[in-house]
Amino acid sequence: MGVFFAGFKLLTLRNNVECSVYYPTTTLTDPVNYVPSKRAWLRFHHYLKLSGSKLPSWIFHLGLSFLNYIELPVQFESPIISKEHLALARKFPVILVSHGMACNRNLYTTFAREWASNGYIVFSVDHDEDINLPSGYSAKELKAYRFTQVKKRKEAILRVLDYISNADNIQDFFDNSGIELDLTRVSVVGQSFGGAAAAYTAMADKRINGACILLDPDLESVYEEMKGKSVNLPLLIIRTQSMDASLLRGGDNKEMIFELVMNNRERFKQSMSCSFENASHISQTDLVLHMPREIMMFELMKDVGAVEDYLILNNKLTQTFLDTMLYDKDPSGGFQSIDLVVRKFLTFAKKVKRGTKLIVDKVM
């Protein structure tokens, strides 16, 4: 955690676009309920069915009913800090988040709270798409179906970006606090299917000009559309072996990730694909904190003993990457190398004595 608490507000735009907003605050207020809606958990149950689970929906909802009583560790509608609290009274950098297919806008609060406590404003967009696949579709048709959903996600993300690009909207949303967003440092983050949406959106709109972080991205649905193209931003990809094993095309997703890094030619020295030893796909979400036994039962993670390690190290690596790429400049005024991020992170990992190993992929 940084020097601030994390505030929380809900932003609702036209066409039912909802967004959880996390921001730095110094005021303690009430917490927020973890579950944003019943439909959010329907998506998770549908995902389990696609993964082969035969668990009846009533048992699923009964078993996870305790989540309705869990509260997010954030401060509901607390006032945002003034810009004088920030170093050099700078403007607030922005992070746009696209969640995984079975997830929701509140499921990355561990990350969002970390970033907000360090002075970032995070807009986590909710995507209410149908996870169930149409019957009788060929593999090509299924990929096209998922790509249509990626495009809708891009539209939702850009709708949020349109809104926050208007200074008057920001003043209204933050109660005329006088704060300013730094629209020269707009970053995008996505996990799993949200990683595909984040990368695709970054390529489509140059207003996303900060950094791109992809957490275990599933790139199959956008591969043909992004082939040979570059996000042209500092790029951090944290993948897991469990994701590679779960995809229909197996190891091809890893090759797609490596290709995305290689294509990022102008920012290759600021790009990295990596993983944490034995981490699983779900270890990048808040679920590992709230339901470790259930995760073991659903066989979504082999070892929950290292949950705290994964969360702490994921948070620190992403925070170090953002701060270094957005604010640390080399002697010529350009971006620092990704090597500096790795050195800073390894120094932290050694200091806190976390045993989980960072594996940096050799992308050639």
Predicted regions and their residues:
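Domain-level recognition of soluble alpha/beta enzyme cores
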Residues: 1-94, 318
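Active-site machinery of serine-nucleophile hydrolases
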Residues: 39, 46-58, 106-139, 269-273, ...
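Short substrate-entry loop that stabilizes the transition state in hydrolases
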Residues: 73-92, 97-134, 244-247
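The feature captures the conserved acid-bearing segment of alpha/beta-hydrolase catalytic domains
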Residues: 86-89, 209-281
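Conserved hydrolase catalytic core segment
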Residues: 200-210
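Alpha/beta-hydrolase-fold serine-hydrolase catalytic core, especially in secreted/extracellular enzymes
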Residues: 278-282, 287-364
